[in-house]
A protein has these predicted regions:
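Conserved AdoMet
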Residues: 2, 42-108
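Intrinsically disordered, low-complexity terminal tails and inter-domain linkers enriched
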Residues: 3-24, 169
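Residue-level signal for inorganic ion chemistry
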Residues: 48, 68, 98, 125, ...
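Conserved SAM/SAH cofactor-binding pocket of Class I
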Residues: 100-196, 244
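Class I S-adenosylmethionine-dependent transferase superfamily signal
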Residues: 105, 129, 201, 223-227
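Conserved SAM-binding loop
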Residues: 140, 212, 238
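Mobile active-site "lid"/loop adjacent to the S-adenosyl-L-methionine
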Residues: 188-219
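Conserved Class I SAM-dependent methyltransferase catalytic core
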Residues: 215-276
Length: 279
């Protein structure tokens, strides 16, 4: 994307007509975003204009978007499964396809009372599950301190706790054998394919949230191996993965002693492997 664009404040509208000023400002924002390659320039312009509190803030938001910052990071929030989630630079932006993971969790464990969001990023999955399930004991964990800080804000309304550390090492020991839903949006992009990702992800999101190792399954293997010790009887592990990795992910779950099931949403291009505790 180009580093400069027409300023949204520059227009020849009659300043005595507020509606004309507003229309001219929107048009200028749309032009700037479209020139930068934003496919949904009109929708993005409306979101920026609704979020910005001052013309200066609006111009700064447009400039950041033109420079390639993801829209969600520009406005500071993302809509996820009906929940507005706070996001900030350096944090993985929740994807719409991951809503399918939440749907699968709710379908298979609608009465879960203990929920863990592993590799939580902003805590979007945990917040969405808590919003749908009602009062639950909610924990989230991530290795990235920036993500944990963001997750704490998003989980506060649900009484949730976010912990910093490496996977299960971050969780309170008292959760062992008690978790009804263990959701893990693990990184699953093979290392060699990270440079091929869109610039918005490659340049503005943490590598730890994207890079899944040589075949994209390094973190998934560790999560599957550790999950049985943490799941309650009848508890479930849910992990999002890519289409190519899905068959191997199912095998990993089975080798870990879980009963696996692959669910696919073709519209969202989402693949979720669910592992059911057998004990």
């Amino acid at each position: 994307m180009p580093s400069r664009s027409p300023s949204p404040s520059g227009s020849s509208a009659d300043s005595s007509d507020p509606s004309a000023d507003s229309s001219a400002s929107r048009d200028a924002v749309v032009v700037a975003l479209r020139a930068a390659g934003c496919v949904f320039a009109e929708d993005e312009a409306d979101l920026i204009l609704a979020t910005a509190r001052t013309p200066a803030e609006r111009d700064a938001m447009v400039a950041r978007r033109v420079e390639g910052l993801p829209l969600e990071l520009v406005v500071g929030w993302a809509e996820f499964h009906g929940v507005r989630v706070t996001v900030e630079p350096g944090v993985f932006v929740p994807r719409r396809r991951t809503e399918f993971l939440v749907d699968q969790a709710l379908a298979h464990a609608p009465h879960a009372s203990v929920v863990v969001d592993l590799c939580c990023g902003s805590g979007a999955v945990g917040a969405a599950l808590a919003a749908s399930l009602g009062p639950v004991e909610l924990h989230a964990a991530d290795i990235d301190p920036v993500a944990v800080r963001c997750a704490r804000r998003n989980l506060a309304a649900h009484g949730g706790h976010a912990h910093q550390g490496d996977l299960f090492d971050a969780l309170p020991a008292g959760l062992r054998g008690r978790v009804g839903i263990l959701a893990a949006n693990v990184p699953y992009v093979p290392t060699g394919e990270v440079p091929l990702l869109p610039a918005e992800a490659r340049d503005h999101e943490p590598l730890t949230a994207l890079d899944g190792g040589g075949d994209g399954l390094d973190v998934l293997r560790r999560v599957a191996a550790g999950a049985p010790d943490w799941l309650a009887p009848g508890g479930i592990l849910l992990v999002e993965t890519g289409e190519r990795q899905a068959p191997a992910a199912v095998e990993v779950f089975a080798r870990a002693g879980l009963t696996p099931r692959l669910a696919v949403d073709d519209e969202l291009f989402a693949h979720v492997v669910t592992g059911f505790a057998v004990r």
